[in-house]
């Protein structure tokens, strides 16, 4: 009896859609789910598909060619560990487990180490694109043993999204947790993109009182230019969607933004690495403060502030917001890729930043036209310290920074919260500052804690008795 080249464990929507994606590329796929009903449901809903159901782990594992390729699409955390433990008794040395869940990269490093010691291969794989991407072609970020990746690369390449130039949106990222780390930073950048767009929306509503139809038209125009991206594209559609009562749906959605924790992971890692991920972290905090709805409503009746005044010429202000949004986006990516560089050095991953930008060009949530500019920047100078220093991005900063400053100044004067736009200005000015007031902080630290300091006019480390 012939055996399958790959099996998928976990038949929730992402696992189901990836299995169907793999099947559509000409493979017969073994499928397994902890609950029998889920597996039966997938088979019943997809008659004629080359999906072969199994109802015991042993039969599932034995149905696969060796070395076995098993894609796990189960709940991250304890669920992943439990799935791995259930598979191990039936695996042979050299078999490959691919974890496609939203897994914390440190867990992937641990699992890679533990499974490698037992003779198994483990590939932690970031998968971006949501339900539709899983079915039609996601962006895929695999990390683990390079030789194991080579054995699964033909399948991953076939199921990945394809960019406009025909390149598949998958590449080997690096050892152990590199793939899941890049996916984590991707999600952090996604948080930043979404909050920047939300602030642009708030400015256009508060400053110009644009209607939903006007907002949709504005975003349509933006999507035809340098802001062209998946998130801008879907946002234009959101503005005009109505509910069953004829109300604009976006206007009746509660203003509390939920999260699944991946943005927080990105910010926590930035703190561990000493990376100033300010814009992305502000986007995480913006979601947190949005969840304080009752407190915000109460505070709105107590705390005073300015009432928003008209922002002036409509076309001029829209263009300023567009420029501010694009430069803010550039700052967000500059921070994210700077963090990737720091992580690559810390964990010895040897990341290829240009290739990472390339696989974000299709399939994933942050796909955008300007990602090619990032790839070009790293092709020109692979060692560039920060994307803001690349010629294209430097020119945009030169041309657009005044618009960003004007928009932030207007927002502050008119009581419109713009935490990520503000963070973009602060980061840009801090990064370009040859001198910062940190000398005073060092003096304070030495004063109360004898933490010492360095001088600009002498070599060495110094301490002063400040009360003498």
Swiss-Prot record:
Impact noted for substituting residue 52 to D: In strain: ECOR 10
Alphabetic keyword roster: Gluconate utilization, NADP, Oxidoreductase, Pentose shunt
One Pfam family matching this protein: NAD_binding_2
InterPro entries: 6-PGluconate_DH-like_C_sf, 6PGD_dom2, 6PGDH_C, 6PGDH_Gnd/GntZ, 6PGDH_NADP-bd, 6PGdom_BS, NAD(P)-bd_dom_sf, Pgluconate_DH
Binding residues annotated for substrate, in chain numbering: 102, 128-130, 186-187, 191, 260, 287, 445, 451
Domain of life of the source: Bacteria
Substrates-to-products reaction catalysed: 6-phospho-D-gluconate + NADP(+) = D-ribulose 5-phosphate + CO2 + NADPH
GO cellular component: cytosol
Active site: 183, 190
EC number in record: 1.1.1.44
Similarity-based family: Belongs to the 6-phosphogluconate dehydrogenase family.
One GO biological process term: pentose-phosphate shunt, oxidative branch
Enzyme class, broadest EC rank: oxidoreductase
Binding site for NADP(+): 10-15, 33-35, 74-76, 102
Result when mutating residue 32 to Y: In strain: ECOR 70
Pathway assigned in UniProt: Carbohydrate degradation; pentose phosphate pathway; D-ribulose 5-phosphate from D-glucose 6-phosphate (oxidative stage): step 3/3
Effect of residue 55 to F: In strain: ECOR 10
Organism expressing this protein natively: Escherichia coli (strain K12)
Role noted for this protein: Catalyzes the oxidative decarboxylation of 6-phosphogluconate to ribulose 5-phosphate and CO(2), with concomitant reduction of NADP to NADPH.
Entries under SMART domains matching the protein: 6PGD
Effect of substituting residue 325 to Q: In strain: ECOR 69
Effect of residue 209 to S: In strain: ECOR 68
GO molecular function: guanosine tetraphosphate binding; identical protein binding; NADP binding; phosphogluconate dehydrogenase (decarboxylating) activity; protein homodimerization activity
Protein name: 6-phosphogluconate dehydrogenase, decarboxylating
The protein's assembly and partners: Homodimer.
